[in-house]
């Protein structure tokens, strides 16, 4: 259940985007707004309070940092109450030419979705995560200093 994308930005630049919780609704599909971000995000245990859906039919929920290795890996527990919790792992690695590869893995971390076979879960999350990594790439690439006049 891993989606990978090569990004034309450094690993440090991609990490800057991930480490700024206020960018979350810009690259995470389904999030419509950010309501608050803990000041020491993305330290383990910190949260982003966000809304899912289109106004006025929004659900207010949160995403919590499970673990973090700055510049390398971010593991999130994204809650979508009352339905489920997803465990999302983002791993960054260097590529030649100052580029970065992002690997995004999402698995159900609570019932009832965790009862579904991995292959069925993949059908639901792979297209969404491809779009998430595409959006993340666009945000990271947009701010490459050589590309800004």
Provide a role label for each language-model segment.
Residues 8-12, 39-42, 66-71, 91-101:
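A short, structured loop/turn motif at beta-sheet edges
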Residues 35-82, 87, 134-149:
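Glycine-rich portal/gate segments that line the openings of hydrophobic small-molecule binding cavities
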Residues 14-18, 24, 48, 65, ...:
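Hydrophobic pocket/interface hotspot
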Residues 2-6, 60-62, 87-89, 105:
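Well-ordered beta-strand positions in beta-sheet-rich domains
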Residues 77-131, 147-149:
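Beta-strand/loop substructures that line and gate deep hydrophobic ligand-binding cavities in soluble
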Residues 17, 27, 58-59, 85, ...:
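Alpha-helix N-cap/helix-start motif
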Residues 2, 35-36, 53, 117-120, ...:
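Conserved short-loop catalytic and cofactor-binding motifs
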Residues 1-43, 149:
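Hydrophobic ligand-binding cavity/cleft-lining segments
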């Amino acid at each position: 259940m891993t989606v990978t994308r090569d990004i034309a930005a450094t690993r440090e630049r991609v990490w800057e985007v991930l480490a700024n919780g206020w960018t979350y609704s810009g690259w995470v599909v389904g999030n419509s707004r950010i309501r608050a971000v803990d000041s020491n995000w993305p330290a383990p245990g910190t949260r982003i309070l966000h809304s899912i859906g289109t106004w006025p039919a929004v659900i207010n929920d949160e995403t919590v940092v499970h673990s973090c290795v700055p510049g390398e890996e971010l593991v999130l527990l994204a809650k979508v109450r009352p339905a489920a919790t997803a465990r999302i792992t983002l791993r960054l690695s260097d590529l030649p030419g100052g580029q970065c590869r992002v690997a995004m893995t999402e698995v159900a971390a609570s019932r009832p979705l965790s009862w579904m076979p991995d292959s069925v879960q993949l059908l639901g999350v792979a297209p969404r995560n491809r779009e998430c990594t595409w959006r993340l790439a666009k945000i990271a690439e947009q701010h490459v200093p050589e590309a800004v006049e």
